[in-house]
Amino acid sequence: MKPMTSGGIVERQTSLAYLNPQFMESDAGRPMRILSEYLAPLQALQEAHIHDTVVFFGSARIGETGPLKQYYEDARDLAGKVTRWAQSISRHHCRLVVCSGGGGGIMEAANRGAVEAGGRSVGFNIGLPFEQRPNAYLEQDLTFEFHYFFMRKLWFAHLARAIVIFPGGFGTLDELFEILTLKQTRKLGRPICIVLYGSSYWREIVNFEALARHGVISAADLGLFHHADDPDTALQILKDNVHVDVRAPSPDLARSSTPCCQE
């Protein structure tokens, strides 16, 4: 029986659209889901005064044990060094904050190194049916769970002043080529330093020289990135290429730009 008011009028049960899970999880609600993955991190990062980041990419499968364990220790060490360097630049603004994909392996090592150095760190996690779970070294208010890979990658690029890319698989390669494309096409509104960590690995996995030799990239594109094989070398590359003026804090977000075509 339908509920009736005292006047005999039927009372209808209604819900606000944004509180309706059936709508929010539907195809029609997709634009709202995408927008929420932009606005929610934006608000949290601004409230935490996170100005810019140094992003660590790398495999979730590289842990403290196993044949590639040295990369875990190096990522942990480098993240600590980056954090102490950032603290020496400014203790009043959150500059060059270590950021990772929020999962295990190299991502965990980066967040761990930052925490052990007494700094903050950011985790942009992705919901997957396997492998990816937030690591234990993340701060709750700086940990973000994404449904969409492209929104997660947008946030990596938005704040990054530098990206250090450790050995990894499909996900790491996806992130590497995305950021190389953004830098090559000058779509980022500010300079970004890219460091490939582990030169023997990267030279075996990706033959950049062959790409240039075949003419599908220019020889100048080989200068889009640096190689490093130890934390001290990687840190020095960052110091030489990332310039932070604490008197003029960086904008909260790196703006995308489309270079003007000139004849």
Residue locations for each model-derived region?
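Short, solvent-exposed amphipathic alpha-helical segments in soluble enzyme
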Residues: 115-116, 178-183, 210-213, 242-243
